[in-house]
Structure formats: structure tokens, C-alpha cells
Amino acid sequence: MATYAIVKTGGKQYKVAVGDLVKVEKIEGEPGTAVSLAPVLVVDGSDLTTDADKLAKISVTGEVVEHTKGPKIRIHKFKNKTGYHKRQGHRQKLTVLKVTGIK
């Protein structure tokens, strides 16, 4: 059975396993830098672990592969009868991580 963990980073939860490439909210660090993903919520290997005391001792490590941007999101604000309209765009900064270990 493959070991996986559910980690929380950037306000979102991700299910990761060793060797996975995951796009997460931007994390500081140059490509090749090792990072640790802190709150581990669940670990499943030979048995499912959800106990907070055991999870505090478990860490998920990864390596920064690259920094990239998400898709362009277009925002358009419009108010009727006043001639007011405003266009805006946004691209979220993302980091691609390769999960190297669940210990």
C-alpha cells in the first residue's frame, strides 16, 4: 500500500505521496531548496494516523522545482446606468514542489 499524507499549505489541503509534483501557493526559496510542509493532517501507510500527538512528530519534506504563475483570471466590474466599468486581471504565483519524503 502506498504511503500518502494530507498536508495544509497556503490555506489549502493537498494529498501527497513520495515522488509527486504538487502546485502550491508561492513558497519562498530558490529551485533545489528543501522545504518542510508543516501541518500534517492525516498519514496513511500500513495504518491510518489521525492522532495529533503522532502527527506532530511526522514531517513531509519536499524540494522546490520551479516558480510559475497560474492561469489569467479576468475581473470585470460594471455598474448599470452610470457608465462605470473596470477591467482587471490576476495571475496567482505558484510553486511546484516535488515530495521527497514522509517521515
UniProtKB/Swiss-Prot annotation:
Keywords: Ribonucleoprotein, Ribosomal protein, RNA-binding, rRNA-binding. InterPro entries: bL21-like, bL21-like_sf, Ribosomal_bL21, Ribosomal_bL21_CS. PROSITE patterns: RIBOSOMAL_L21. GO terms for molecular function: rRNA binding; structural constituent of ribosome. The keyword RNA-binding applies. It holds the Pfam family Ribosomal_L21p. One of its GO terms (cellular component) is cytoplasm. One of its GO terms (biological process) is translation. This protein binds to 23S rRNA in the presence of protein L20. Belongs to the bacterial ribosomal protein bL21 family. Part of the 50S ribosomal subunit. Contacts protein L20. This is Large ribosomal subunit protein bL21. The lineage of its organism: Bacteria, Bacillati, Actinomycetota, Actinomycetes, Mycobacteriales.
